[in-house]
Swiss-Prot record:
Main location: membrane
Membrane-topology descriptor: Peripheral membrane protein
E.C. numbers: 2.4.1.227
Keywords: Cell cycle, Cell division, Cell inner membrane, Cell membrane, Cell shape, Cell wall biogenesis/degradation, Glycosyltransferase, Membrane, Peptidoglycan synthesis, Transferase
Gene label: murG
Name used for this protein in its record: UDP-N-acetylglucosamine--N-acetylmuramyl-(pentapeptide) pyrophosphoryl-undecaprenol N-acetylglucosamine transferase
PANTHER family assigned: GLYCOSYLTRANSFERASE, UDP-N-ACETYLGLUCOSAMINE--N-ACETYLMURAMYL-(PENTAPEPTIDE) PYROPHOSPHORYL-UNDECAPRENOL N-ACETYLGLUCOSAMINE TRANSFERASE 1
GO process terms (BP): carbohydrate metabolic process; cell division; cell wall organization; lipid glycosylation; peptidoglycan biosynthetic process; regulation of cell shape
Domain of life: Bacteria
Pathway annotation: Cell wall biogenesis; peptidoglycan biosynthesis
């Protein structure tokens, strides 16, 4: 198969950027050239150069906002963003454009269609955002991380994630060897989650039966805040870190995860086969995190608590119930793995090749 150039448009948060990087790695392993279209201000401005990818940095701002001035300026801002994206596509001449989300993907998708470049859309969340609902009408192929997120034309391929997570032992094998205190992995994301910092230590300290082992990823911004909360709760043995480099190892270690329900987190939980208590971000756009969590709960792999539930003390009883029964946790882990899409990265890469070759 001849070498093709694939442009990946994604930016802003890890939920868009890291799946894009997974696909980029797969395409490069197959000998193709990949160029990234994003903004320097987003997460991609740091991690894309570190991955050794060529990039076009676009001066594009978000399109959502409130107020008459913002609404009145929208046509001009969108037109300028599409023009900037179009210039980048003329320079790079990609054979196919893959939109992976974030506000950069909208203008790039429009520019791709105006330039006659084949367009593939990938929607990571169970509830599609406004941009992808529009771009789905223009895409040559429409891919989703969850079933039925973009209607009848869409193909459920799953969310591309880090390969090592798929290679973990089965939940039954992992839990069969477990002894001692339960192990809780708390994921607050790169920005931290203040609600988890506050309420998880309180809940763990109240369940009794000895202290659990805790690994809490709190992000740089709320690191000291989280450490303080564990100290107040008397859980001095909790390990609170800004970032976890080896996520596969962390999932393999954990009995239970407490986390927000971003698309990437939910996909990794399914692939790893780890049960979870999910607390959707209350102000997530289109409330997509609630939809993500409900999908994993429907499979019997997770429990969902809303943030007000944490404030009312509901987390402690749920943790006590789950952490006291490793057999049940193993069953939930198997249920999680049962809905995983382990071939998502390769499938998206293959679809890029199919579209690029016409």
């Amino acid at each position: 198969m001849s070498v093709r150039t694939v442009a990946i448009a994604a930016g802003g948060t890890g939920g868009h950027v890291y799946p894009g990087l997974a696909v980029a790695d797969a395409l490069r392993e197959r000998g193709h050239r990949v160029v990234w279209l994003g903004t320097r201000a987003g997460l991609e401005g740091r991690v894309v150069p570190a991955a050794g990818l060529d990039a076009e940095w676009l001066e594009i701002g978000g399109m959502r906002g409130k107020g008459l001035a913002t609404i009145a300026a929208l046509p001009w801002r969108l037109g300028r963003a599409v023009a900037v994206a179009g210039a980048a596509l003329r320079r790079q001449r990609p054979d196919v454009v893959l939109g992976m989300g974030g506000y950069v993907a909208g203008p790039v998708g429009l520019a791709a269609r105006l330039a006659g470049r084949p367009l593939i859309i990938h929607e990571q969340n169970a509830r599609a955002g406004m941009t992808n609902r529009f771009l789905a009408r223009l895409g040559h192929r429409v891919l989703t991380g969850f079933p039925d997120a973009l209607g009848a034309r869409s193909e459920w391929v799953g969310n591309p994630i880090r390969t090592r997570i798929h290679r973990l032992e089965s939940p039954q094998e992992r839990y069969a060897r477990r002894e001692g205190a339960p192990r809780v992995l708390v994921l607050g994301g790169s920005q931290g989650a203040r609600a988890l910092n506050r309420y998880v230590p309180q809940a763990l300290s109240a369940i009794g039966g000895g202290q659990p082992q805790v690994l809490h990823q709190a992000g740089e911004l709320t690191l000291e805040e989280a450490r303080t909360e564990y100290g107040r709760a008397g859980l001095d043995g909790a390990e609170v870190v800004p970032f976890i480099e080896d996520m596969a190892g962390a999932y393999a270690w954990a009995d239970l995860v407490v986390a927000r329900s971003g698309a990437l987190t939910v996909a990794e939980l399914a692939a790893a086969g780890v049960p979870a208590v999910l607390v959707p971000l209350p102000w997530a756009v289109d409330d997509h995190q609630t939809a993500n969590a409900e999908w994993l709960c429907a499979a019997g792999a997770a429990r969902r608590l809303l943030q007000p539930d944490l404030e009312q003390g509901a987390l402690g009883p749920v943790l006590a119930e789950l952490l006291g029964d490793r057999r049940r946790l193993a069953e939930m882990g198997e249920a999680a793995r049962g809905v995983a899409r382990p071939d998502a990265t390769d499938r998206v890469a293959t679809i890029c090749e199919e579209v690029a070759h016409g």
